[in-house]
From Swiss-Prot:
Keywords associated with the record: Lyase
Protein name as catalogued: Chromophore lyase CpcT/CpeT 3
Keyword field contains Ribosomal protein: no
Documented EC number(s): 4.-.-.-
Pfam families hit by this protein: CpeT
GO molecular function: lyase activity
Physiological role: Covalently attaches a chromophore to Cys residue(s) of phycobiliproteins.
Family per record: Belongs to the CpcT/CpeT biliprotein lyase family.
Organism in which the protein naturally occurs: Microcystis aeruginosa (strain NIES-843 / IAM M-2473)
UniProt xrefs under InterPro entries: CpcT/CpeT (IPR010404), CpcT/CpeT_sf (IPR038672)
Length: 202
């Protein structure tokens, strides 16, 4: 799996003790996954690459900051989604919280994970609004996460809210994000299937 080069600096620079589950979720997300395998058997699934890496920014002892981008595999220089993920204990310490933020000046961060960790600098001013939170709990072999019951607000492609369920497991991640309009009708996203992101092989 294509994780070592992206993750190594992260492991070497972590000096503060973290909630083991917070660390576990972050470790699982870091690396490169794609939907290539699923797309080969289902032509309706786009070939998408998801790249996630640690950033040089730790304002809170019990949180880990990650940069994540998603792009069509043949257009990696044009990601359609760029986020900062803050992985931390939830307010009541019952789950792990993954809180996603948009970025100011997002084009400046394209292919951010190709840089060395010491060059992946993030400032508070780089963070725009928070867009969604997923709450994760450990399951056999990984973690399961969901958005709040009411979903997260959005204005993407005719939807006013999104919901998502993710499963982190030994082969990668399964995700089923869905967008709903003001009448509660699904307007985009997973139907009966889930999006299957799998670790890239070296």
């Amino acid at each position: 799996m294509l994780k070592t080069s992206i993750a190594l600096g992260f492991f070497l620079t972590q000096s503060l003790p973290l909630n083991p589950q917070v660390q576990g979720v972050a470790n699982h997300l870091i690396g490169v996954m794609d939907t290539r395998e699923q797309a080969q058997t289902n032509p309706r699934i786009a070939k998408v690459q998801m790249t996630t890496c640690a950033v040089d920014f730790s304002p809170k002892q019990d949180s880990i900051y990650l940069y994540q981008e998603q792009a069509i595999i043949d257009r990696l220089n044009q990601p359609y989604r760029q986020r900062i993920l803050v992985i931390q204990p939830s307010a009541d310490n019952s789950t792990v919280e993954s809180k996603a933020y948009k970025l100011n000046n997002a084009p400046n961060f394209i292919n951010f994970c190709n840089k060395d960790l010491t060059e992946r600098e993030l400032n508070v001013s780089d963070l725009a609004e928070s867009v969604c939170t997923v709450f994760l709990q450990p399951i056999a072999g990984g973690y399961r996460g969901e958005t709040p019951p009411q979903g997260c607000p959005t204005n993407a492609r005719g939807a006013v809210k999104i919901t998502n369920t993710i499963i982190l497991h030994s082969q990668g991640m399964d995700t089923s994000d869905r967008g709903y309009d003001s009448l509660g009708q699904q307007v985009w996203g997973a139907q009966d299937n889930v999006y299957q992101f799998r670790w890239q092989k070296p």
